[in-house]
Amino acid sequence: MPLKPEIQEFLKLRAAANLPEVFQVPISVFRAGTQNHPILAAKLPDIYLVEHKNIPGPTADLPIRIYRSTNETNTPGLVFFHGGGWTTNFLDTYEYALRNIANLGKLTVVAVQYQKAPEHPFPVPFDDCFATLEWVFKNCSKLGINPNQIGVGGDS
């Protein structure tokens, strides 16, 4: 099956621009590019509550965000780990999506800003995520989350 014409045109323009491959760019340059994402300028969906906290991690305190769609207790929960190959992206990039997930799913979402490689090599980012999951389980009652209805998700 041939590619759609708009995809062919995009690939042609990208090739003509002679852009470096992701692995050829310093990580600081690549990260800076993710901080200019158009979604950061979008109007954010209304939500009942967004709470910013720091929780203890294995090697450092970890910033988390808690998105509550309602003031009800005993709601389902989702612990969300953002994509980026353990090296890029940050919570602000996901603000729009996480508000929507919480609202549409009628649940509480907890997302973590885990430490990134190469400054913090694997398994540090994974350990940060796992510590966040453990923290959520230990704090279900404070978070208003039903401990029998916790999911784990993310993107890559």
Give the role of each language-model region.
Residues 19, 107, 145:
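Short glycine/serine/threonine/alanine-rich loop segments
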Residues 64, 79, 101, 122-156:
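Short strand-loop-helix active-site module centered on a catalytic nucleophile
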Residues 74-84:
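Short beta-strand element of the alpha/beta-hydrolase
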Residues 90-92, 120-122:
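Conserved catalytic-core motifs of eukaryotic protein kinase domains, centered on the activation segment
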Residues 91-111:
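Short amphipathic alpha-helix adjacent to the substrate-entry channel of hydrolases
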